[in-house]
Regions:
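Disordered, acidic Ser/Thr/Pro-rich linker "stalks" and the adjacent N-terminal cap
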Residues: 9-85, 93-100
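Short, surface-exposed beta-strand/strand-loop-strand elements in extracellular ectodomains
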Residues: 98-110
Length: 110
């Protein structure tokens, strides 16, 4: 799965606390076996905001693009098996006023 974030609500940073893929029945696809194949930018200097935080089952952790890196931001996730997806659910950072709210995203499935 490829996520291409093309715009945000404020600034150039993007952040995802949790991401879920829904199957054709609207059920969440198990995330065991998911791996990050590529991120165009991640904030890992002195903090741990790497791509794998998107599906680590902890809403308090998150992936965030590196400060100053402009859009688009791309994350490639290997779902570990074929998935017939009908939708995704995205949980943003939960802190009040936190940067990184994503406005537009394109999702590509193979």
């Amino acid at each position: 799965m490829i996520l291409e974030m093309t715009d945000g609500y404020e600034g150039t940073q993007a952040a995802i606390a949790e991401l879920y893929v829904l199957d054709n029945n609207g059920e969440r696809v198990p995330r065991e076996g998911w791996t990050v194949d590529y991120v165009s930018s991640e904030d890992n200097e002195g903090v741990n905001r790497t791509g794998d935080k998107i599906f680590d089952l902890q809403e308090s952790t998150y992936w965030q693009s590196k400060p100053g890196a402009g859009y688009p931001h791309i994350v490639v996730i290997d779902l570990g098996r074929p998935v017939n997806a009908s939708a995704i659910q995205y949980l943003p950072r939960m802190e009040p006023g936190a940067p990184g709210a994503i406005k537009n995203v394109k999702v590509y499935m193979k």
